[in-house]
Structure formats: C-alpha cells, structure tokens
A protein has these predicted regions:
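Processing junctions and N-termini across compartments
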Residues: 21-24, 54
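The −1 position to Zn-ligating cysteines in a subset of zinc-ribbon hairpins
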Residues: 26, 38, 59
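Short linker/helix segments within small regulatory modules
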Residues: 43-56
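Short Cys/His-centered divalent metal-binding micro-motifs
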Residues: 32-35, 56-86
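A boundary/linker detector
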Residues: 1-17, 24, 31-36, 81-108
C-alpha cells in the first residue's frame, strides 16, 4: 500500500501528457527531441518533490547522447547546478517569476 507521500510524488499520466505538450516534446535543457521523456522531477522525489506539472520537466534519457536527466540526477555538483539553473529559468519563463522550488515539496 502506497503512503500519501508516495502517491503525491508519483507522476500521473495526465501530468506527463501536459508536460510533454508544454515542453514541445523536447528536452528543456538541450533542446533535443529524440529519446526524451516528460518524467524528471525538478525537486527530487527523495526530497518530497511532487508529481505535479510545475515540478516535472522533459529531459533526455540515457539513450540520448546528452543524457541530461542522468546528469541532473547523478552528475557532478557543477553539472547539477548548471542544469538546475537552466530548468529554473525555463520554468519561470512559463509560470512567471513567482515559480519557486520550495512550492514543489510535499507537505503533510
């Protein structure tokens, strides 16, 4: 049985579809459109990142040479910071400057 937090951090198919359209079927970091998926939490699930449209972006999978999702999750500190800055700028361009990472966290 899933906990409330686990359910809240899952990404429903409806959210993936909205994100896929919002991101124009492309990685929001490098712009590639092959081997990309709308399933990357900006604030990670481990940190309570919600599975909502404002916390999910489309990034390259490991099949894409750029591997943006892998670098964002497992890269060097510098890679993670650079990718986060690009994602943050993108999200603010979509949702306005009121978009904040702190609003993407699960709250009890």
């Amino acid at each position: 049985m899933k906990t409330k937090r686990s359910k809240a951090t899952d990404i429903p198919q409806s959210v993936k579809k909205k994100v896929w359209e919002r991101d124009n079927h492309c990685c929001v970091v490098c712009g590639m459109n092959g081997y990309v998926m709308p399933n990357a939490h900006i604030l990670s699930r481990a940190k309570g990142g919600l599975g909502i449209e404002t916390n999910i972006v489309t990034l390259c999978t490991d099949l894409n040479p750029n591997k943006c999702h892998s670098k964002y999750d497992n890269g060097t500190k510098e890679e993670k910071e650079r990718i986060y800055e690009l994602i943050e700028a993108y999200m603010k361009s979509i949702y306005g400057y009121s978009w904040s990472i702190k609003d993407q966290r699960y709250k009890k």
